[in-house]
UniProtKB/Swiss-Prot annotation:
Protein's name according to its UniProt entry: Probable transcriptional regulatory protein ckrop_1032
Cell compartments where the protein resides: Cytoplasm
Keywords per UniProt: Cytoplasm, DNA-binding, Transcription, Transcription regulation
Similarity comment: Belongs to the TACO1 family.
Length: 250
């Protein structure tokens, strides 16, 4: 169950400049609203809400914004939007498969934003189901390396449904079936192991190897997609070698 990959998750992490930071805050706030609406506004009784609040705090979202989002979602305060999750599918440069996960209160706006970003940046929309079958829904928990060892994590999650524990360089991740995410999270808590995030994720069965030029085109497309306020997550099946990663870092 042990592995190492600098690119184990193909969900692109955006640069923390001011404009993107503001958009990231908005996405985290939406996650809190939805979690509170789905499972109630008490973080101690709603692990998903608790995780979303912790993630927002780690990203330096102001506490007042977090609390208002929690109250809107739970109905304690008016103004919550009717968010729905919509997933779009497509292809990027080099035949890279792309899943675009939106959380929106306007399906037509989300579809237009996604289609425009794809068309202007070398992507193509695909029919429903033509890309999604290449991905599996997983549960992914990320833990800091500081204070944790791979052996400790393995011992904690072996009987909780974990499929892999990966060393990502600066942190560890535990991968499970999506339905086992809660059990893995609970097992880590019982073992006294602190984690940074615990969320559903999509992982591709078959990866597409790209060179640095191809990777830059995909990253440019992902940035364009994530400029939409409705786009929450972008997943791809691209795979980058250590050599390509080193070239991208230069």
């Amino acid at each position: 169950m042990s592995g190492h990959s600098k690119w184990a998750t193909t969900k692109h992490k955006k640069a923390a400049n001011d404009a993107k930071r503001g958009k990231e805050f908005a996405k985290l706030i939406k996650n809190i609203e939805v979690a509170a609406r789905t499972g109630g506004g008490d973080p101690s009784a709603n692990p998903t809400l608790d995780d979303m609040i912790k993630k927002a705090k780690k990203a330096s979202v102001p506490n007042d914004n977090i609390e208002r989002a929690r109250k809107r979602g739970s109905g304690e305060e008016a103004g919550g939007a009717d968010w729905e999750t919509v997933t779009y599918e497509g292809y990027g440069n080099g035949g890279v498969a792309i899943l675009i996960e939106c959380l929106t209160d306007n399906r037509n706006r989300a579809a237009t934003d996604v289609r425009t970003a794809m068309n202007k940046n070398g992507g193509n929309m695909a029919d429903a189901g033509s890309v999604a079958y290449m991905f599996n829904r997983k549960g992914v928990v990320q833990l800091p390396k500081e204070g944790n060892t791979e052996d400790d994590i393995l011992m904690a999650v072996l009987d909780a449904g974990a499929e892999e524990v990966n060393d990502l360089g600066q942190n560890f991740e535990v991968v499970s079936a999506a339905g086992d995410l809660s059990a893995v999270r609970d097992a880590l808590k019982e073992a006294g192991l602190e984690y940074d995030s615990a969320e559903p994720d999509y992982r591709a069965d078959v990866k597409v190897q790209l060179d640095a030029s191809g990777a830059r085109k995909i990253f440019h497309l992902i940035d364009a997609l994530e400029d939409s306020d409705d786009v929450q997550n972008v997943y791809t099946n691209m795979d980058l070698s250590d050599e390509v990663l080193a070239e991208l870092d230069n």
